[in-house]
Amino acid sequence: MTDLEKHVNRPGRDKQVKKVREKINELGITYIYYQFISVTGRVVGKGIPADHWERTAEKGFQLVYGATANLFLDRHNNYIGYGPEAMELVGIPDPETFCQLPWDKRVGRVFVTCFRNREERNNPGGHLTSDCRGNLRIFMDEFQKKHGLELRVGTEPEMMWLTKNDDGTPTGKGFSKPFCYHIDQFE
């Protein structure tokens, strides 16, 4: 059984998938963002109509591997990490992360775990090594099995000094630019 198949067939996951369907129907959600974190920390993913929830929960969706590196190019204009000839990753939603977006009640979001394509020659359906969130879960599970302890992690919020428009949204202008750690901030 592949890593992907083990993930889809986790005990209790089928019940979680059904609970998400109930929530989708109850809240009137019509569209779902399937999200994962790129190696640079950006939230990337795919949007799919909510009518396809069960199928996507079972089979996943496919997306170009380069999305894990924001489809960035190197200085030679080659995709970072994966070339255009590469197969596509498979994203499998983690139903326990599903929620409705507070700013658009018609839309839900769910985080996914990324896997190698099912048709890959090497390690088909294996965990995708560039899946930051998936790797963290694997490391946490291994740590708990080895040490009998729970690994605790948190976020480090960043700060920028921005001004606001009259409606409260950021203007993108202010004392600093909206690019954390960009060297231009030091000038």
Where are the regions a protein language model picked out?
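Glycine-rich, acidic/polar active-site loops that bind/position phosphate-bearing ligands
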Residues: 1-187
